[in-house]
């Protein structure tokens, strides 16, 4: 019995390790996408380039994104219109950088574990 439990514990630890590695990879992908969004100017009504980025990001990961003008959306795997639906909604445009901004607003920078750049803690982070 002890050897079975050890095998189960070992398999559970391996499975958890794989989940953590997958989560780490997803976090890295999300941060990289946010960096790309920060580096791409996207003022209101001029966000076609960030819409392109979001559409490509979703498509490269196997989603079937749709787009109307600069609005991008995708349905989760297993979506069933007959079942209750949860809509996650955000925007990907930014305001004009303020004159008092102390950094290059379009140069994503990580310092002390924090990501700086225009839109990094606004809806850009929510989109990602």
Regions found by a protein language model. Name each.
Residues 17-118:
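Acidic/His- and Gly-rich active-site-bordering loop/insert found
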Residues 119-128:
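Active-site alpha-helical elements of protease catalytic centers
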């Amino acid at each position: 019995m002890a050897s079975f439990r050890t095998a189960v514990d070992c398999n559970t630890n391996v499975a958890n390790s794989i989940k953590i590695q997958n989560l780490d990879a997803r976090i890295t992908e999300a941060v990289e996408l946010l960096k790309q969004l920060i580096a791409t100017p996207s003022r209101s009504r001029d966000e076609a380039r960030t819409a392109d980025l979001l559409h490509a990001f979703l498509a490269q990961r196997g989603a079937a994104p749709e787009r109307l003008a600069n609005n991008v959306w995708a349905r989760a795997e297993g979506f069933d219109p007959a079942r209750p639906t949860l809509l996650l909604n955000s925007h990907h445009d930014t305001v004009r950088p303020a004159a008092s901004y102390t950094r290059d607003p379009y140069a994503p920078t990580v310092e002390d574990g924090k990501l700086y750049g225009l839109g990094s803690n606004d809806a850009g982070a929510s989109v990602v």
